[in-house]
Amino acid sequence: MNAPSTMTDKKPEVEHLQGENPPKDTYSAEDTATAILRKKRKPNSLVVDDATNDDNSVITLSSNTMETLQLFRGDTVVVKGKRRKDTVLIVLTDEEMEDGVARINRVVRNNLRVRLGDIVTINPCPDIKYAERISVLPLADTVEGLTGSLFDVYLKPYFVEAYRPIRKGDLFVVRGSMRQVEFKVVDVAPDEFGIVSQDTIIHWEGEPINREDEESSLAEVGYDDIGGCRRQMAQIRELVELPLRHPQLFKSIGIKPPRGILMYGPPGTGKTLMARAVANETGAFFFLINGPEIMSKMAGESESNLRKAFEEAEKNSPAIIFIDEIDSIAPKREKTNGEVERRVVSQLLTLMDGMKARSNVVVMAATNRPNSIDPALRRFGRFDREVDVGIPDPTGRLEILRIHTKNMKLADDVDLEQIAAETHGYVGSDLASLCSEAAMQQIREKMDMIDLDEDEIDAEVLDSLGVTMDNFRFALGSSNPSALRETVVEVPNVRWEDIGGLEEVKRELRETVQMPVMYAEKFLRFGVTPSKGVLFFGPPGTGKTLLAKAIANECSANFISVKGPELLSMWFGESESNVRDIFDKARAAAPCVVFLDELDSIAKARGASAGDSGGGDRVVNQLLTEMDGVNSKKNVFVIGATNRPDQIDPALMRPGRLDQLIYVPLPDEEARFSILQTQLRHTPVAEDVDLRAVAKATHGFSGADLEFVVQRAVKLAIKDSIEEDIKRENETGEAPADDVVMDEDASVSQVQRHHVEEAMKMARRSVSDAEVRRYEAYAHQLLTSRGLTGFQFDSADSNTNGPSFGNDGADDLYA
């Protein structure tokens, strides 16, 4: 019972619950949605700290805390931890402790499923009785090779020397004769907990318990094992925990509690994990139905299996029935050919309707294809609520990483926030795989110190293991989001410095793609959605594809490269479906850059091709609708590249779709010099090679043409170097290896002038002057047809209007 004085210590927000109406602005919509997650801090909620003594029956508090809780030294209390676990302990006091803290040892913490820093709740337990009979069994690995009586050496001294309350299911450790033995309380009579007295009968004989069996229950999933879906967890707890634990809430307000919840979302986001956590934390009976398992070839058996599952759950209420992969047993009836599936769907409908209103059974189902489920199941009264368990944001990913690394030994340089920021599109299972791969990489690095033939690995080696940031970097390089496994998704390794010239184009790209990803809050503050599309056009070989790769790398976005023709299919409707799939995957892995290369092959002006069945037009229509539907909340950028801009459907190039039209011209002399430097930055070049002269002589060459010149020159240098080595080897006979190293300078080790001159003889332009003129005319036409170049606001002292667009108003159709 709490002291009366503490009632005034409650926070104002808790008091609102007792008043008539809380102030309207107390909670935001987000707060209301996650209200169930807010723990109301009570005086008897204490923070766990490590015990200074190692007694399994003791909890130590400060004298102020004991006074607040009206407890005395030696009182017996019930301590509640996580996952509905509790135990009974004796209270001791320590003057030096701070208030609001409870000290318990490791064994008690394991029994309560809590860690240091977690919260436990303490309540007095004045009516605890003496136990008549208890049954304890040792854990097998702690009694191996032990001789003598367990009772005389361990149990008798443990219980005779002290006043010990115990609870059924708890573990306790006893020290004696140079070793410690761990026991489990298998049974306590007459109650679940009691105090062991002189008259208590102790049964201790029996088969020792395997630690694996014990630890499987320790590894049960709880709410603290789930990260990245705070809002969804709140929804599920509202709909499941409240009806199961407090059905009277619904009764008193006069509504029926929810019957079912459908969770949907990509694979690996934690749908099944959530259902298990809710079952463990509510203490409900958990009945798992894997979709395909209940199907049977015998007539009527599939429906019978379903009926049995529901009957079993009602007998063991409160219960949760969890149907995994529900789309396999409840597909749309009009689309299934099999009679069995139809009957199973009908049976599921009648069972969910037939559940008694307050039978304390909740049905949960999970799928990653919600639209293939029969619509009759998705109405109120069956699956009342649908919870979208989506891909986590950076904060969610950080939560998940912390959960997966809480038992890992991490080096000091590991920055989990940085990893969370870089893992766009990763779901919980991907992050678990990432942590596991990083740990494996650390083990691989230490392989030379590990002797696999030895039974025991040296303790020093085990202590030296620690996962570093480099291990995580390696794991990041070798993994990608599971949503994009079937699409070739890569964060390319092209950087801005790999692209020579094009400074103006790079600046525009940074503004369009990099800024919305890196400064999203600025766009929110100004109340605009950033543009989502860019079209590069220009002659072949000017670096359009390279630019798209570089921008995806610079803002750490995922990159999906789609070659135009590979979207087209001979089957009716397949091409549009391919376009849809690409955009769905991009939205799932946002921020993502979708790069449509050779856009003119799939987005030709509609109506131009009279011969086909309209397949090309349908693809264009699908592209248009997808680009309008690139959700403003998702950072999906579409970059198109073409060297035939006049053939692309004009509807694609309006503002709101591919609104940034960027002309990538042939490089000028300065840009050509920059490209040559970029191409040769890792190549040894003789000092007398004048790249300026090469840049001057290659007027009209594209970046690809210059790359050909460089490759040709390097190839000639390598050829000369090999010939020089062979010649020298023939002259000196079998020269020893160190002589070869000494004479290295004598061989051709650089690209020299004559190599470049020879390469220039083979050089050729890939773009003719006529083509360049055509591109420039098109770019000029776009520039002049689009801009109100003369517009200015009226100045304060002037009454004249600014220059109008076109001629005076007489010719204006809308005047």
Swiss-Prot record:
GO BP, one annotated term: ribosome-associated ubiquitin-dependent protein catabolic process
Binding site residues for ATP 1: P267, G268, T269, G270, K271, T272, L273, N368, H404
SUPFAM superfamilies, alphabetized: ADC-like, Cdc48 domain 2-like, P-loop containing nucleoside triphosphate hydrolases
Known regulation of activity: The first ATP-binding region has low ATPase activity. The second ATP-binding region is responsible for ATPase activity. ATP binding to the first ATP-binding region induces intrinsic activity of the second ATP-binding region. While ATP binding to the first ATP-binding region appears to prevent ATP hydrolysis by the second ATP-binding region, ADP-binding to first region promotes the coordinate and cooperative ATPase cycle of the second ATP-binding region.
Top-level EC class as recorded in UniProt: hydrolase
EC number from the UniProt entry: 3.6.4.6
Pfam families linked to this entry: AAA, AAA_lid_3, CDC48_2, CDC48_N
GO molecular function per UniProt: ATP binding; ATP hydrolysis activity; ATP-dependent protein disaggregase activity; polyubiquitin modification-dependent protein binding
Region described as Disordered: spans on this chain: 1-30, 794-815
Positions contributing to ATP 2 binding: G541, T542, G543, K544, T545, L546
SMART domains: AAA, CDC48_2, CDC48_N
InterPro entries per the UniProt record, alphabetical: AAA+_ATPase, AAA_ATPase_CDC48, AAA_ATPase_domain, AAA_lid_3, Asp_de-COase-like_dom_sf, ATPase_AAA_core, ATPase_AAA_CS, Cdc48_dom2
Keywords on record: ATP-binding, Cell cycle, Chaperone, Cytoplasm, Hydrolase, Nucleotide-binding, Nucleus, Protein transport, Repeat, Transport
Subunit record text: Component of the ribosome quality control complex (RQC), composed of the E3 ubiquitin ligase rkr1/ltn1, rqc1 and mtr1/rqc2, as well as cdc48 and its ubiquitin-binding cofactors. RQC forms a stable complex with 60S ribosomal subunits. Interacts with ubx2 and ubx3. Interacts with lub1. Interacts with rbd2 (via C-terminal SHP box); the interaction is required for rbd2-mediated cleavage of sre1 and sre2.
Function: ATP-dependent chaperone which probably uses the energy provided by ATP hydrolysis to generate mechanical force to unfold substrate proteins, disassemble protein complexes, and disaggregate protein aggregates. By recruiting and promoting the degradation of ubiquitinated proteins, plays a role in the ubiquitin fusion degradation (UFD) pathway. Has a role in the endoplasmic reticulum-associated degradation (ERAD) pathway which mediates the cytoplasmic elimination of misfolded proteins exported from the ER. Involved in spindle disassembly.
Family: Belongs to the AAA ATPase family.
Protein name per Swiss-Prot or TrEMBL: Cell division cycle protein 48
Underlying gene: cdc48
